[in-house]
Amino acid sequence: MTYDEYKEKVKTLKKWAYAYYVEDNPVATDEEYDRLYHEVLDYEMKHPDKALEDSPTKRVGGIVRDEFTKAKHIKRMWSMEDVFSKEEVQDWLDRVEKNVGECDYFCEPKFDGASMNLLYDDGKLLRAITRGDGVVGEEVTDNVRTIRSVPLVIDYKGLIEIRGEVVIRKDDFEQINEERLKAGEAPFANPRNAAAGSLRQLDSSVTAKRRLVFYPWGIGENTLDQKKLSEKMEFIYGQGFLRPPYHEACHTIDNIEKFYQFLISKRDEIPMMMDGMVIKVDEIEKQEELGYTVKFPRWMCAYKFPAVEKVTQIRAITLQVGRTGVITPVAEIEPVNIEGAMVSRATLHNFDEIERKDIRIGDHVIIIRSGDVIPKITKVLIDRRTGDEIPVERPTHCPTCGSELLDEGALIKCQNLECPDRVINTIIHFAKKGCMDIDGLGSKIVEQLVKEGKIHDILDLYSLTYEDLADLEGFKEKKISNLLDAIAASKGAPLHRLITAMGIEHIGEVASRALALEFGLGIVDAKYEDIVAIDGIGEEMANSLLEFMRVNREKVLKLFNTIKPTVEKKVEAKENPFKGKIVVLTGTMSESRGKIKEMLEELGAKVSGSVSKKTDFVIYGEDAGSKLTKAESLGVPTLTEDEMRAML
């Protein structure tokens, strides 16, 4: 076989593979495909230096890993703001157009799958990373290479991040679950879980069998010069990526609503699960001008589809004990399929709601589920009662530890601080991101450690040894050392994160920061009048903090002594031209904008990402763009970086 013949056969094999795996429309028999596949493989084994990067043989799974490594996105992968009605869409449009004027909008289906970031370097697929926390995800490149709708090579120089959704078709999802049931394995709850679970297989040959599909929806790092997102996406589609079955350019709320209703009408026909429609400002310059909140881009939102209702029957009511001791009733229901998700539980919130709705065991009820929202019961079908239904009694003793419960009406609490369920949930909260961020200490491991008697409270984490973990099922040398290293690394964390991690009722991240700055380690002895004097801290929060410290003072002091948290210093900015001012930065400065932002915040300024009439100063560097133009049109004072420094 000559090299030209080899290239032609690779081209044919790619066409056949795409038709079979992506379009679900085979154009060759299995025998023909296998024969051609092995001809190509034989040539590549004899001439490995001539093997093409995008040959279908490169996709076959078989690589087995011990674990996944963490990898950082070049540009952050953001979440999206959700809207649920035409009125909420109009509010969102009003906010957008108030800042940047009339816009073109790019609308497309929102597929329900696992978000993925593909990094290409000079056209070759270099890395595939899960969304993770938006900054860091898990590298799953070997698994993603098995997805036929992911090109291994594209026509692009330099680095480009192509973001999209990995999904499973509805028919394939049902087939996978049938196979899992036959093998004695638990079925996946929904296609999203199936896609995510398939991507996290340590053996890539398992992923290869799952027939995953990748739909691109956005771009991170890139040097494309198109002025609109839709134009950039046309370039991406032209590289061999799948185009969504429908997408639309819209200009008004009526255009948007019409396309939204059209997608709803196609919901059952489209082979992938959709849970809404994504609306994006199309013009790149306006996207940059709108910027981002802490969580979302201001230039895009997800218009979620209506909740789906189903009728089912309550089999039993079980009780869950949270970290604060609150007892939450959960309805165990006859399993029902809602939009591809098998639902077997629904939240009941509290016992007052059970009494208000007169919910009984054996009742037929209507439940709804919308997106990621936990299914809930909306109505009891009283006309279907037979008389055999059993009223639900308010519990008097904890289902886990048996201690007497405190009934406060809507809330019923277990007051035993050593209740195993309270301990487990307290430690899970303590270890999660935004708190102590102990990597690898997930819910299953916490449950195992508590049930095996290795830990009884948070403090016990910091005295765990290799020997404590060596005899536990599933704990190998590397896993043990990684966990112990992660626990040790959490020492010295900022005090506000430790306060958040303690799980004090009503005290969230923002309040924890304010308390840490005001009191430092003296928070254990803080007085009521000093607490409520802090901006944003009310009576309920103050009382909650005081009660927590009264009960747990000695434990908190031991935590401080063990963890030695970093105490942030409260520095009152001296009088300066920027104290209390709203400032916007734009253009290239002599040092990173992050450092200049930090400097201005230390001076008491609030640094915003967008220009408005409320902006006091726009400070600009080289290649300043639309923010500077908008400031000038609004009459907002503008300063060069040198002028800003001169004012100081």
From Swiss-Prot:
Active-site annotation: K110 (n6-amp-lysine intermediate)
EC number: 6.5.1.2
Keywords: DNA damage, DNA repair, DNA replication, Ligase, Magnesium, Manganese, Metal-binding, NAD, Zinc
Catalysed reactions listed for this entry: NAD(+) + (deoxyribonucleotide)n-3'-hydroxyl + 5'-phospho-(deoxyribonucleotide)m = (deoxyribonucleotide)n+m + AMP + beta-nicotinamide D-nucleotide
GO biological process: DNA repair; DNA replication
Residues given in the record as NAD(+) binding sites: D30, E31, E32, Y33, D34, S79, M80, E108, R131, E165, K280, K304
Stored NCBIfam families: dnlj (TIGR00575), PRK07956.1 (NF005932)
Its biological purpose: DNA ligase that catalyzes the formation of phosphodiester linkages between 5'-phosphoryl and 3'-hydroxyl groups in double-stranded DNA using NAD as a coenzyme and as the energy source for the reaction. It is essential for DNA replication and repair of damaged DNA.
PANTHER family per the UniProt record, alphabetical: CHROMOSOME TRANSMISSION FIDELITY FACTOR 18, DNA LIGASE
Protein name: DNA ligase
Protein's organism: Sulfurovum sp. (strain NBC37-1)
Recorded name of the encoding gene: ligA
